[in-house]
Each structure stands twice: as C-alpha cells, then as structure tokens.
Amino acid sequence: MAAVAGLVRGPLRQASGLLKRRFHRSAPAAVQLTVREAINQGMDEELERDEKVFLLGEEVAQYDGAYKVSRGLWKKYGDKRIIDTPISEMGFAGIAVGAAMAGLRPICEFMTFNFSMQAIDQVINSAAKTYYMSAGLQPVPIVFRGPNGASAGVAAQHSQCFAAWYGHCPGLKVVSPWNSEDAKGLIKSAIRDDNPVVMLENELMYGVAFELPTEAQSKDFLIPIGKAKIERQGTHITVVAHSRPVGHCLEAAAVLSKEGIECEVINLRTIRPMDIEAIEASVMKTNHLVTVEGGWPQFGVGAEICARIMEGPAFNFLDAPAVRVTGADVPMPYAKILEDNSIPQVKDIIFAIKKTLNI
C-alpha cells in the first residue's frame, strides 16, 4: 500500500509544482494598422472621451467618408455628431468655426485640402486670428483635416501641398503625419488642443500599414505638437522631411548605407511650430543638411528650414551649403510620367545627398 501511495503522491506533487510555477508574461505585441485606421481610431477615442467633439464634412457619415477614414463612426455616434454637409466648404467650415467659438470641438474634414481654398476666409480670418484679436478670451478649438499634396492622376487642381501655405499663418498649428503612429497621436493631440490645428494627411498613405507600437495602442497616447522624431540615426548628413517623403528618405538612407553613407532622417511631424532645435542638434552632429518636401520650391518648408539654420547656431557647423529637394515649380501634370517627374523620388534624394557630401 505504501508503494501504491508513493506512486500516487509523486504525480500529485509534480502537478502541484506546475500549478505554482510562474510563467513569464510578455508585453502585448505591436499590431499592424493602416494610416486610415489609425486616424479613425484616434477620432473614435476622442469622440468617446469628450461629447463636445463632433465630425462634419462631405460624405463623412453614411458613406463612411470619401476615403473611408470615418468608417463606422456614424453608426456608433449618430447624426448629431457625425454630420454630412452640402458641397460648400465656405458654409460648413464657417459652421465648424462658430461651433468651436461656442465651446464645441469640431473636426472639419475637407475632401481634399485643395478645396480648403473655398473656405480660406473661415480658416485664416475667423479661426486663426480670433484668439489673438480677443486678447486670449476666445479660443477656437477646431481641427481642419483631410488629404494634402500629390495623389495619383488627379492633376493640378487636386495635387497641391499646403504645408507652406498654412505654416505661414500665425494662430494656426500645422501637423503632417507620415505613419500610423504619427496619425493617431497627432489627431488626438489636435482634437484636445485649444488652438485651431490643420492636419495635412496624404491620400496615398491611407492604405499603407505600419506597425503600431504598444504604447500607441493606449487611449491615452498623444504625440506632442511641435516635436519632431529621428526615424533613423546617422552621422554623415541630416535629411529632414514630412508626410510621404519621410518614407522616400528612409529608402534612400537604406541604399546609401550600403555605400558607407549614414543618413540621419528626421520626421518633422509638425510644420508649425517647427522643432528647429531637433534639426539644429542633428546638423551640429552631421555638418550637412538636405530637406525634402513634395511642395513647390519657392517659399517652401525647406526654404524655411534653411533660413532658420542660417540664422541660428548650427550654421557655423555646416561643411557645405544646405540642399533642397522639392516638387517641380509647375502645376501638377496629369500624365503619369510627368507627374512622377514633378515630385521627389528616391533617386532625387540620393543625388542631392551625394551632391551635398561632394561624392
């Protein structure tokens, strides 16, 4: 009997040991999320968090948005918070600005920022200037968002980049996300900001999936407006970009790395207020600078960066003149081959970097 009892107790002890054993719990894995889904998730979380937030624009409700960025929000929040508007940018932008002045937090979607020109008086004269003109008594917490810059085959009237246009205006904050992390963190910060914020998205990036880090999956995740991010560390040259060209810069950096050239790639994230300190610190390390943007060259984002570097402490660290890579100084052509030659490509960035380094 003792032998039998020993046979029984042995497995029981082993089972007890298994029950007491502590297993390692790994952190939740990063998930793949498209830029479209990231913006949608960010808006959803803020709509849920604050009942003063609402979305309006053309086809944003029952149709789920022209680019499906607002998919599912109308079914969840209803007609009073997800509002379809007539095709009248001046009209619905004015309604949104008035709602912001009354204490709500509207998200005003333009089907493309080219159409925001129809509402420029509301954006600049009403939204951007009111806080200053009221001596700080009247905030205008509104987000103007939608696709910006070149798309594919939509020609001159649908392909402009408005980063420099809106970045020129005091009273506005201007953000320009590249990946899903940028998109979610910036839309949430923009909605919570008490100033008018212009969020320049990119139609060609909506369907691109990126890994969303664990911290970005939190409902409390925010990206500070006015802070750039170093996407790739390097020692030979600083390359600064925003929106879709950030990806082109990283591709160029990967190619050049095989040749022994290490590029430091900075994702601006915010156009205004610009994180010039991050750019200066990088230039002081690499001693070379290239800026990349999809907009026109004259009075552009790159021109502003170069001017600020020239006026600041980093200028004395440059070993060569800064070089800009921009869109061509023409209205966007319709033909694909001309369109491709009108916006910066990876080969153009590589050429500019080698030119700056005199290679």
Curated annotation (Swiss-Prot):
The cellular location(s) given in this protein's UniProt record come to:
Mitochondrion matrix
User: Which Pfam families does the entry mention?
Assistant: Transket_pyr, Transketolase_C
- Cofactor field: thiamine diphosphate
Which residues are listed for thiamine diphosphate binding in this entry?
E89
Give all N6-acetyllysine modified positions: K354
InterPro entries associated with the record: PDHB_mito-type, THDP-binding, Transketo_C/PFOR_II, Transketolase-like_Pyr-bd, Transketolase_C
Positions carrying Phosphotyrosine are Y67
Under catalytic activity, the entry for this protein gives: N(6)-[(R)-lipoyl]-L-lysyl-[protein] + pyruvate + H(+) = N(6)-[(R)-S(8)-acetyldihydrolipoyl]-L-lysyl-[protein] + CO2
Q: Which GO terms describe its biological process?
A: glucose metabolic process; pyruvate decarboxylation to acetyl-CoA; tricarboxylic acid cycle
Q: List the disulfide bonds.
A: none
Enzyme Commission number, as recorded: 1.2.4.1
Transit peptide where, by residue?
Answer: 1-30
This protein's name: Pyruvate dehydrogenase E1 component subunit beta, mitochondrial
Identify the species of origin: Rattus norvegicus
